[in-house]
Amino acid sequence: MSALLSGIIIEVGSFAFIRLLGGILILPTYATFAQPLLAVAAVGTMFIGNLSALQQDDLKRLLAYSSIAQVGYILLGIATLTPAGFSASVFHIWNHALLKGTLFLLAGVVTFQIGTRSLKEMTGLGRKSPILAVLFTLSALAMTGVPPFGMFWSEFLIVLSSLTVGSPILTAAVVLMLVNLLISIAYYFRIIRTIAFGQPSDALNANSGGRVPKLLIIPCVILISLSLITGLYPNMFYQPAVNAVKGILTGFSR
């Protein structure tokens, strides 16, 4: 359920925002007022999400706050009030859904295996289950925006579309987005360090549930593979986002 809520339902609101208001907000009459407000809201959402995630020991709660920050990135693309920015945001929705869905599924697997959501109690999990450590590491790295995963391209396109507008407010928002990316790197690397390295904690030794069922791992492998394919062939997935936005804005212009 957590994977569904974070990977799909949260993003539906962002897409609905573009669908319902995008064509109206790009009108010059509204853009003058809407753009600064959206940019400030985007940056505020990023900081609230990332700074809250940075303080969490509960893995699922950390991922949930991280999702709030991702909505901020999506909102920054919307704040450009351009087709390129809208398309970048829709593309980011796809990439976030894949990766955050993977991480929530993995968090569920760990909870199923050892009965805890505490990162401290997951120390050394990789020594008990290398496959979980590998999947957590790949997913967390991908969420930080490193290539060759798809998140790199959608974040790059959000930055590019924001800078192309030439607005000082959006330029400042991009700088603050980069600061937020550094914050997210800090807590995602904490996940990697905790799970993939170190000696197994006492709680882990006491509660380890043995081998991880393949049926729990296969969906995670599929999702992270889709993220990798998106990064290697970005236009295959970006173009549908462009077409969707074009269809929305064309509908408003009629």
Regions found by a protein language model. Name each.
Residues S129-I131, L181, F189-R254:
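Cytoplasmic/organellar membrane-interface segments at the starts of transmembrane helices
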Residues M1-F156, L160-Y187:
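Hydrophobic transmembrane alpha-helices and their helix-loop junctions in integral membrane proteins
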